[in-house]
Structure formats: structure tokens, C-alpha cells
Amino acid sequence: MKKQILLSCALAWAVMAGAETIDITTFRYAGPYVVQAPFQVDSVDVNSKTFVSGRLLDTHLSVDVLQQGTLFTGGVLPGSDSGYALHMMGFVLENTRYATAKLKIDGLKRYQLYVDGKKQEGTELALEPATHSVVIKYLSEAGKTDSLKVSVDTDQEGSISLKQDNKKLYTLADVLHGTRFAGVGLSPDGRYLITNYRTTYVGGRSAGSTRITELASGKVLAERTENMQWMPRSNRYYYTRTGVDGRQLIVVDPLTGMETVLVNKLPDGYFQFAPTEDYLLFTMTQEGPKERKEIYEVLEPDDRQPGWRNRSYLAKYDLKTGLLQPLTFGYHNVWAADISNDGRYLLMMTSQSRLTKRPTTLFSLYRLDMQTLQAELLIDKDGFISGARFSPDGTQVLVSGSPESLGGIGKNVKEGQTPSMTDGQLYLLNIADKRVTPLTKDFNPSVQRAVWNKVDGQVYFTAENRDCYSLYRMNPADGKIQQLEVSEDLVNSFSLAQNAPVMAYYGQSASNSDRLYTMNTKKMKSSLLEDLSKDILKDVELGECKVWSFTNSRGDTIYGRYYLPPHFDANRKYPMIVNYYGGCSPVSRNFESRYPHHAYAALGYVVYVIEPSGATGFGQEFSARHVNTAGEGVAQDIIEGTKQFCKEHAFVNDKKIGCIGASYGGFMTQYLQTQTDIFAAAISHAGISDHTSYWGEGYWGYSYSEVSMANSYPWSNPDLFVKQSPLFNADKIHTPLLFLHGDADVNVPVGESIQMFTALKLLGRETAFVAVTGQDHHIVDYGKRIQWQNTIFAWFAKWLQDDATWWNAIYKPKNL
């Protein structure tokens, strides 16, 4: 049955098409724009075609002029009294499911059609879920008028709506495009700020830029494409450029813009300024021995990684003499951890392999006297430390590492538990007597980045705090930790002035993109400096994000959150997607990520994000549950949480629940299907199907297993490696399961998906496998990521919304 839906200009909201035809009666109009026939130098063009008036329709006119247009509801189109003129008529369609339609345009003779700013050949439309602008550009002639009748025909009843409220759905395009922060840096006196940006344009091109701002006035002093950094003491910034004789080091006064060439022939390699500004510390690379291309020896598992045989060493470049003095020599990697404020001492770390015992890589920490080149060993062969920083006076060292660092002095787990090597801790080392104090043993958040501030002597750090990245300040004298009040769920980066109580930081939250702030560290008050989110989310409609936690059968509180679709109706039933990692870290409240939750919700799903046992940010005992469990306990948390969520929220259709995870989360997706039948669809991206093959073949398989399967090996614990592998339980899976994988993945090799896909095919189960050419563990190529994401959306639409249209459009059915 064919019904008509007539929309007048009084309609200010989207009306769902209740039938197969939508008549468009209200447009936004812009025009007329008079165009003239060009002067004809010749009678024909280069292709031997004569000029006809219809070619004026090809005259460029941006569809953006409609933004300033007026409403038009008449049947006879506006014309022009002056020869030929161009006009624009536009309207907006919206669909939360993939839809095909045919646009009927009657009455117009000379027109062009644009959908989302792109010229459309023909009137057949294939609309991915989004808010779409449709523009008809037509050519009028003086004294002649045209009428217009437009309708949209679709076989998918209720799939398309017509919008007139200037709002739009949040889509992957909003995730990919626009400007984001890439870093911040305060000048030593806190008066100026360097802000780094990264902009991605439609089509995938991206570019970086840097801005220098005077904070007091907000005045922009400079904008450049080079990467600029502050000198450590003087309020000047520096950058490098290619000069006639080689790489140049340029120093700039931010107030005057005056440039000084500090070094004319700067050596290659990464460098940092000494705090005293009289020398540069270089990290250099020495190439290791080469193998033949046609046949080659692999010395140890990591030798399969490109560049593994190369070694790093340190050198000091004297800015007065130009002498590049090597500081270290040998075949072990050496890197700098910190330089003392007086420039006298260097903290440096070395690494060495020890494959026969966990941990298989050992680190040593030295204090090197830059004058005598004599080194003092501070920490010897500790595989659990990760970094170190001097105290402002140089008498102590702030050491970062895991709970097992320094003999396990910072462990806080139950008897029989092995701590997670990814749970970040801080320790205080007194150089004089080598006494070590654990600073975060009873602190649940997992430390990420720490800075010892010279101004107030406090340690500022970010830490995973459940699903947030919170900002903290610690007094190293008594170990007291204070959480700082910030305006975002996640602090992604921060900078402290060397000589002033000023901090700059930026971050985002569950429902907004990047925003930049300054903070007075005495008053502890933040001020918004720049809001990139405002432009990214202009006119975008988002659903709500709410916290939801439950108590599992073991008595633990399992935290989570959920996202609702825009225009949520609690009386409806919605399909739900469950997202998790299930590995060593939480799924943070990033607004933009590999799995942008609001973009899923915009398609009509409730999205439940759960933080099961084993994640950092909840305390050492909780994160230790990741070790030697291989999904046991984690799966129970996800299953119990999903069931309880449905029980407490009647708006979820518990027959239409999907789940998705990547990497270890991909393993969890596969493993879950061997444990439960509550899911109607599942997606595993780059998931582990066999712990033994991943352990042996992945570049970091055996080393990550030091975290997840500490002191366990395929021969010593086959129950863990085999019985907990989905491949050996494939016959228990009955859920439609999609495997996604980059075919160049060196972390979790693509064979992990291939072998599981093969098993399910031989078992006659519903499954699909999509490989992404040339992509590694993450799908980072712009165009391929869009196709990858659409594949995910289409799989869920097929099984959770009973609509295979999108899937069949991407992967056309084949008779093979």
C-alpha cells in the first residue's frame, strides 16, 4: 500500500516515513545567481563540442550557500529577470539504517543533483545511516518558469525521515574529520603556551600545525607547521629545519619572532636540551649486522621484528664547541630517563634479554656523571621497572614500574596472586643509601605519566581511575595523594611550567571531544582556554551516557556505563551492543576511539560498556585477575552484567544483543560464545583463538604472555593454553560470529581468525571472515577504516535489526 506524507514548513522535527513514498513540499532555497555565457574565443572547445546554454549549469557554486537560504513551499520555481541564473533547492533526509531509494524530480529540465555535497549521477540513492543533505541545482532562463515536484520512493518502509531542525546524527565522519589537540607545552615562566594540532580532512589527508599563544592576552604570537618546543630555562622556543649545509637548530623569541641559528650542522638523531641549555643529549642508533635476503638466521624471537638488531646509545653535543661526545658504548640498548636540573647527572637505562625466566627482559638504571663519565648503578637487572626521574634537587629518583618492581616492595595482592605487569606504580629511591619507598601500594588507580615539579616540589601524574584518566598531585615527603578537580573524564596530556604555578592540560569526556584548559596549581582552579569539541559537535544530536554498575556473584562491584540513542523512548525495545576489552586495561571514556560508542547508539542501539575483572585502574588485586585466567571470571562478569542490565532495563530487547571486542577483547568475544547463548551476534577483531599459536607466532606473543600467563607455558599448563582457547571449544559456538583482521597483523597474526573461521565453517555454523589488506593490528588507513567500520555496522544490522540490506550491499551474495 502506498501512502503519502506531506510535510509543511511548520514541521520542525523529523517525521518518520510511514510508507514507501515521501513527497517533499518544503525546501531551503538560495538564489538567483546570475551567470553569463562566456566570450567564445573559438566555436568549439578542445573536445570539438560547441557551447550550449545548458553548460552554464556546470558553473561552480558551493552548496554551502543554502545555509543562508530561505524556506520555499511553492510549486512554481523562482526564476530570474536577467538572462540565465543558477538556483539551489535543498532538503535533508535522515536514516538510522542503510537505505536505498529513488529520487523523483518532475518539472525541471536543466538541473544537477548533489547528495552530501557530491554530484550524483542519476537519481538512485544508496544512503548509509546518517543525516544527508540533498541539493538540486537548476538553471533558469529569463521569461521562463519551471515547476517542481520531488518525492523519495523506498521499499524499506519507515527507513527514511525528513528533517527540518538543522540537527544531525553523530557518525563516523564526525569521528574521523576535524581538528584535535596533539600536544601542549608551557614556557618556563608559564606566560606562553605551545599547542600542537592535528587536522584530518574529508578524503583522509591530514596535517599538523603549531600555535604559540600569550596566555594573559590570548594573543596568537605565531603559527607554524614545524614541531616547536620550549627551551628548558629561557622563554624561547626551538625547532629544526633543513638548511643549505644540513639540519639547523633554530631558536626563536616568542615576543619578537626573532630567529637565531643556534647550530648550523646539527647531527642526525633525537635530541633534548640539557636543563642548563649548554648541551644537547642525543639518542643515536647503530645499525646491527645484516642477514642475506634470500635466507636468514633468526637469533631469538624478537629478531623477527624489523630493526631489532639496531642498538641505541647516548652522546653529548656541546653547543659551544660542536663536539659530539659519545657517552655509552656496547651492544645493549641505552636510553635517557632524565637529566638533573644542574645538568651534571644523567639517569640512563639499559636492557638485556633473559629468555629462560620471567621477566625475559631486564632493565638497569644508572646515574652517569656527565663530567667524568663515571656511572653509578642504582637498580640492577629489574624487569619490572619502566622509567625514572630526578627530584628537583637531584638527591632522589622517582621510579615507575609494576607492583613486582624492586623486589616486590609495592605488591598489594592476595596470597597466590601474581600482580599485573601493566598496573603502574611509583617508588621513591634515595640515591645516597639506595633506600626505596613504595608510594602507590595502596592507591587503586594505575599511574601513567608522572612529573616532579620544581616549583612546589610536588609530583603530578595521570592515572587510570576506573574508566577515567584522572589527574593527581602527590607530596613525595609523606606520600599523600590528592585528586585534582578537572573538567574532563580523561586528561590526555598535561604540561607544567618550570618556574611558575601554571599547568595546561587537555582531554575529553564520554560525550564531548577535545577541550584545553589552564590551571593555577596554587588555587587549583581550571579555566577553559580552547574548545575544539564545540565545532566538532555543532548541530550534532547525542544520546545520554549513564553510569551503571552491578554486584557480581562473587560480591564484586563491576563498573560500567551505557549509551542511549538520540530521542530515546523508554517505552520502546532496543537492540543492545555490549563492548569490553576484558584484558589488562579498562575501556576508557574516550569520546572518539576505535569503537565510538555514540556512533553506535545513533544507529538505534543501546550500548553497554563493561569493565570486567582484570582491568587496571581498580586496584592491584582486581588487575591481578587478568593473570593466568584466560577469560575465566572475566566472561562470567560480562555474562552476569549483560543479564542484569537487561533485567533492570526493560527497554532492551534481550533477544537482540550483540557483543564486540578487539585483540584480547576479540579473544573474549570468541570465548564468550563457548560459554553462553545470550548473544544474537558477535564480532571479533584481531582476536586470539589459540593461545599457543599466538604465544609462539605473534611478535609480542610470548612477552605479553608474561603479563597474562605469568610463569605458565604451553608445556607446563596445557589446561590454560588449550582448554581456555576458543579453537578447542569451537563446537560450543552457535552465535553468528564475524571475524575481522588486518592481513598484515604482526601482533595477533591473521591465522588466529583464519583457523577459527575454518572451524566454524566445518561445523556448519553461521560465520563470516573479512580481512583488511595491508593493515596491522589496528585499521589506520582512512578509506579502509571506513569500510571496516561499515562492515561492523552492517553485521549488527543484519542480526540485531533483522536487516541484511547493508551487508548484502557491501558483500553481495555469491553462488560459489
Map each language-model feature to its residues.
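Active-site-proximal cap/loop segments of hydrolase catalytic domains
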Residues: 609-816
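Blade-terminus and WD-like Trp-Asp/Gly-His loop motifs, strongest in beta-propeller folds
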Residues: 128, 184-192, 228-238, 271-279, ...
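Cap/lid segment of the alpha/beta-hydrolase catalytic domain
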Residues: 532-655, 662, 696-704
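Short loop/turn segments that connect beta-strands within beta-propeller blades
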Residues: 214-217, 253-257, 318-322, 369-373, ...
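Non-catalytic accessory segments flanking enzyme active sites
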Residues: 181-188, 192-197, 201-204, 281-284, ...
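Aromatic-lined ligand-binding clefts that engage carbohydrates, nucleic acids, or primary amines
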Residues: 99-112, 134
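A flexible loop/linker signature enriched in serine peptidases of the S9 family
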Residues: 178, 197-209, 240-250, 263-269, ...
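Accessory carbohydrate-binding/adhesion or oligomerization-edge regions at the termini
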Residues: 20-74, 135-169
